[in-house]
Amino acid sequence: MEWINEKAKTLKQGAIRAMFDRANTMTGVISLGIGEPDMPTPKLVCEAAKEALDKGITHYTPNAGTLSFRQAIAEKSYLKDLHYDPKTEIIITNGGMGALSLLFLVLLNKGDEILIQDPQWLNYVAQVAYCDGTAVRVPTDLEHNFEMQPETIEKLITPHTKALMINTPNNPTGSVMTRETMAKIAELAVKHDLLVISDDVYNTLLYAGEEAPCIASFPGMKERTVIVNSFSKSYAMTGWRIGFVAAPAEIVDRMTKCQENFNACANAPGQYAATVALDHPELCEELRQTFERRRSILLDGLAKIDGIRCNRPNGAFYVFADISSFGLSSVEFCNRLLDEQKVVCIPGSAFGECGEGFIRIAYTCSDDNLYEALNRISYFCKKLIK
C-alpha cells in the first residue's frame, strides 16, 4: 500500500535549505543566506516569557489567541488607526507561515487563482498549490525596483482570480512599494472585487526615511484586505512562532475554526511575551538601526565589485544583486561561491523565473562577517572576470 498522498509528494526541499545543507558539511562558512535576525530575542521579552511560566500560563488559550494579546495588537501596533475589533477581526497564529496556511485552507477552492509577485518568497506558491489554488506570477524587474506594475497585474486578472498577494518590504528584493503604486493596486482590487493579502512581516525594517503604508488604509480596502504579520523579524522572535492576522470577521471566524481543528492555538507563554513586547517599540527600532548600518556596509562593498549591479533596497534585510554579467546561472554562481570561498548566498531562481541572474544576499550576520564575506565575494568575482 502507498502511504503518502499525492499532494505530499509534490512538496520539495527549497533551494534555501539545500544551500544550508551543503554549507553545514563545511567549516569556516559565512552565511549571507538566512532570512532571520542573527541576534537573540531581547532580554525583556525573554523575561516576560519566564514570568508567564512562573505564573502558570502554560495551558491552551482560546483558539483565536488571548483577548489581551488581540487587544494589544488592535490598540498598540501599526493597525491602531484602522480600528480592528480584537474579538472578531484578529486571530493569533503559529507564526506568519501558520497564518498563511490557515488562510489558504479557508480561502481557496480548486482552480482559484492568486496573483503573486515574481520573484517572491518561495513558500507562497507551495502553500497555494497544496490548497488546490493556482499561483499566477506577476513579473517584475530591477529597472522598476522589483515593484509590481498595476497595468501588468490587470492583464493577468481572469474570472478565476480571487486574490492578489503583496509583500512590502519584500523578500527577496528588499524593495518597498510606493504609496502611488499601492493606491493604484487598491483601485484595481476594488474594480475587480479582489481580496488583497498583505504580508507585512518586514514593515518595521525601513531605511533612508522610507515609509510602508498599509493597503487596508486605502478607500474601500479594509473590507477586502487580509493583513498577515508576525513577531519573527521585528522582535527577533523567529523560533517563538507568534503571528497574527487582521481581516474581515468572516475570514477570521473560519480561520479560527480551522485552527481549532488543526493546531488549537499558538503557544501561551509566547503570546504573553509578545503582548509585553508591544509596549516596547524601541526594541524594533534597535533592530532596525542595526540592519540599516549593515545595509550600508553591504551596499558600499558591492558597489566596489565589478560585474555586480543592484538597486538600493529600502526595506527588509536583503539585497537582490544582478550577477548575470559573469555568464553563470544563479545556481552555478552560488554553488561556486560556496565551494571556492565558503560564502552562502541564495540563487535568485529559487524565487521565480524573474530571479534568474540574481542572488539574494541577507545582511543578517555580524559587521565583521559581512566585511569578510565582501572580501571573499570580491576575490571570487575578480577570478571570474579574468
Model regions: which residues?
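Short beta-strand to alpha-helix junction loop
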Residues: A64-G65
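A short acidic, glycine-rich active-site loop
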Residues: G56-Y60
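PLP-dependent class I/II
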Residues: E2-E6, T10-L11, F20-M26, I30, ...
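Class I S-adenosyl-L-methionine
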Residues: F69-R70
